């Protein structure tokens, strides 16, 4: 149980990983006093336990959580700004911004009038479930933060490391912008195999870059045939309706108890 | 370099294990690193070497790494490919590109030898 509010997260100081210490195989080798212990514990277990608690916490407050993963500069924050403008008055949005340094993204989102907090990792290349847990508590104390339908967690810009850490999100969205090139699914498979949705962004730049969308999407689908795929431009608004429809459906499904 | 933070988690677990077993020295650590778990073996080893050199408990400890196999099933013809190596580009039998992977996605502390 969390010390801050009693949410399902284990408290920060608890021994929350359940490694199963099987001491029955331990033995002493003949020449020294050494002892071998079979542990068989996943190093992801601690993060996964906290992520599960985060998910329960989001469920308790009725929020759908999305984890946005991409390289730096793919347009995550701009997409959020446009999304907030489009859904204002309809869906209550909250944002957790993850960056290595600066409050810049949080300032941009705050200017849109929604509750936001900035997590600065001080060098870490990804968010983890513990940071997300603390961040969500801070967010809930922001004006409007007590009632959130849709929580965006904007991960640190990095297509590699964030893919390994479950934050407790309901949906993971991976973004690739047109200038980055279509080879990202092939080169960074884990981000695509672990995601629910693949978004090609900055499609207004397609005339200037060699980015065959079907090739990128095809590569991603080969890795993960269940992946939902969309293309959009936050600048021109092309494709935004499909994205907004997806978000509306997620929130509606959450309200109807269909999303766990 | 998320490998460093994973190594830090590992070191924390090793300290707890050593305390539980009244050990003062970790001699050997055996890890299983799945090819699909998103961890680069060389980076993990590099992180382990750095952190273990700074901890009295771990100084000089040997890190053994097991790479388990992944079972890929071809969605075209059903052929099964079992490998601990890189993800196959396509099915060697029918050239289908979509292969369904099972296993090899975890990072596991298997065994610790201490004294």
Task: Give a label for each model feature.
Chain A
Residues 1-39:
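Histidine-centered metal-binding segments
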Residues 5, 119, 230-233:
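Hydrophobic residues at beta-strand termini and immediately following loops
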Residues 5, 67, 99, 154, ...:
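Residue-level signature of catalytic and energy-coupling elements of molecular machines
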Residues 33-66, 74, 83-170, 181-183, ...:
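Nucleotide-state-sensitive switch-loop elements of NTP-binding domains
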Residues 71-72, 96, 156, 177-178, ...:
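G-domain G4 guanine-recognition motif of GTPases
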Residues 79:
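Hydrophobic positions on the alpha1 helix immediately C-terminal to the Walker A/P-loop
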Residues 161-169, 175-226:
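Conserved C-terminal guanine-recognition region of P-loop GTPase G domains, centered on the G4
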Residues 205-260:
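Canonical P-loop GTPase G-domain recognition
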């Amino acid at each position: 149980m969390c010390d801050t509010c009693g949410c399902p997260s284990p408290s920060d100081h608890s021994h929350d990983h359940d490694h199963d210490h099987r001491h029955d195989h331990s033995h002493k080798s003949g020449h020294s006093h050494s002892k071998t212990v079979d542990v068989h514990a996943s190093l992801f277990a601690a993060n996964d336990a906290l992520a599960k608690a985060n998910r329960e916490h989001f469920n308790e407050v009725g929020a759908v959580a999305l984890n946005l993963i991409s390289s730096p500069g793919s347009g995550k924050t701009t997409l959020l700004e446009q999304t907030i403008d489009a859904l204002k008055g309809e869906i209550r949005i909250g944002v957790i911004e993850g960056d290595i340094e600066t409050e810049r993204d949080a300032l941009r989102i705050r200017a849109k009038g929604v509750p936001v907090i900035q997590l600065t990792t001080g060098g870490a290349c990804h968010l983890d479930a513990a940071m997300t847990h603390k961040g969500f508590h801070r967010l809930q104390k922001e004006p409007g933060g007590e009632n959130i339908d849709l929580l965006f967690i904007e991960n640190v810009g990095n297509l590699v490391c964030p893919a390994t850490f479950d934050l407790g999100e309901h949906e993971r969205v991976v973004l690739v912008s047109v200038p980055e090139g279509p080879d990202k699914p092939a080169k960074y498979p884990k981000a695509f195999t672990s995601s629910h949705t693949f978004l090609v962004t900055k499609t207004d730049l397609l005339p200037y870059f060699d980015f065959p969308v079907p090739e990128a999407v095809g590569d991603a689908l080969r890795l993960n045939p269940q992946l939902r795929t969309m293309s959009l431009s936050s600048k021109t608004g092309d494709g935004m309706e499909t994205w907004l429809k997806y978000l509306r459906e997620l929130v509606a499904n959450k309200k109807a108890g269909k999303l766990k | 370099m998320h490998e460093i933070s994973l190594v830090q988690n590992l070191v924390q677990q090793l300290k707890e294990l050593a305390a539980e077993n009244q050990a003062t020295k970790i001699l050997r650590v055996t890890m299983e690193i799945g090819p699909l778990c998103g961890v680069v073996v060389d980076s993990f080893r590099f992180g382990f070497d750095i952190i273990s050199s700074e901890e009295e408990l771990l100084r000089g400890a040997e890190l053994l790494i097991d790479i388990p196999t992944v079972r890929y099933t071809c969605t075209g013809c059903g052929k099964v490919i079992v490998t601990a190596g890189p993800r196959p580009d396509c099915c060697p039998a029918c050239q289908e590109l979509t292969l369904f992977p099972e296993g090899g996605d975890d990072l596991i502390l298997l065994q610790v030898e201490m004294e």
